[in-house]
Amino acid sequence: MKLPSVTIKQLLDAGVHLGHKTFRWNPKMSQYIFGSKDSIHIIDLVQTLEMTNVALHEIHKCIVAGGKILFVSTKKQATETISALAKDTSQFYVNHRWLGGMLTNWKTISNSIKRYKKLSEDLKKESTGFTKKEILKMGRQRDKLERSLGGIADMKKTPNMIFIIDTNVEDLAIKEALKLNIPIVAIIDTNSDPTGINFPIPGNDDARRAINLYCELIKQTILDAQKNISTKYSEEIESKEKKEEPKQKIKVEVSKPKIKSDATEKKSTSIFSKIKTLASKK
């Protein structure tokens, strides 16, 4: 396992240490706050560094075990970064709006995904058999479903882990994940409630630079885990092939008994007759 390295200087440069105004804080975050400056809470980056490494380790384990991660953030600063992260690592994402029951009512969501895929397929056909008005209506329905479900269209079941940026905004996702005992990795700012978060990362959840840094670290972690899986799979295949190599067969040639031809038999009979005639003359 090779986790990406990050330093406190990198965290500082990305503004990870900058929390919210002191009057907006959540008292449950007090253990992660270093102090305040100009009425802004400063996050303890020593703890951030340690907890980031713990979270990355868990993400790596999840991927190596064959798990899938759902990335969730519907705030403007993170929508593009979250979708890019999921696409680059072959995971799933929600970056528009969290639909109630996305995890807890998966059967209904699955039906909506099927509807979305059906609309997409129908609209791709050159001859749909629909009127222009119907096609426009179908297009609007498809676009609406794509915004909400496009990032989970290939998700066959509930994810093995969920990553969240801004726990206040994504409180519904957290409630559903907790109900299903899905491990949660989340960025928790000074106004966040860390309750129920399995692997919290204290940090700024508003600055684009900070969000980009978190996502880049996670991306490198997942790619390394996937590389490990690929290497392990190749080694297993190679080992299996060696075990199944057939042993060299030793050919044993069995000579067939010689069969006398008719000519040979006639010759033998002739010689025998001559011997018999000579014997009778004596």
Name each model feature, range by range.
Residues M1-K68, T74-K75, T79-D122, N228-E245:
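N-terminal cationic and glycine-rich segments that engage phosphates or anionic surfaces
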Residues M1-V6, D224-K282:
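Intrinsically disordered, compositionally biased charged tails
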Residues G15, F71, I162, Y214:
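Residue-level signature of catalytic and energy-coupling elements of molecular machines
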Residues K68-L70, F92-N95, F163, P183-I188, ...:
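Short hydrophobic alpha-helical runs that function as membrane-insertion/retention elements
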Residues G101-K144, D205-D206, Y214-I229:
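Conserved phosphate-handling catalytic cores of large alpha/beta enzymes
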Residues T128-V185, D189:
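Extended, charged alpha-helical interaction scaffolds
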Residues L172-T231:
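Short glycine/threonine-rich loop/turn motifs
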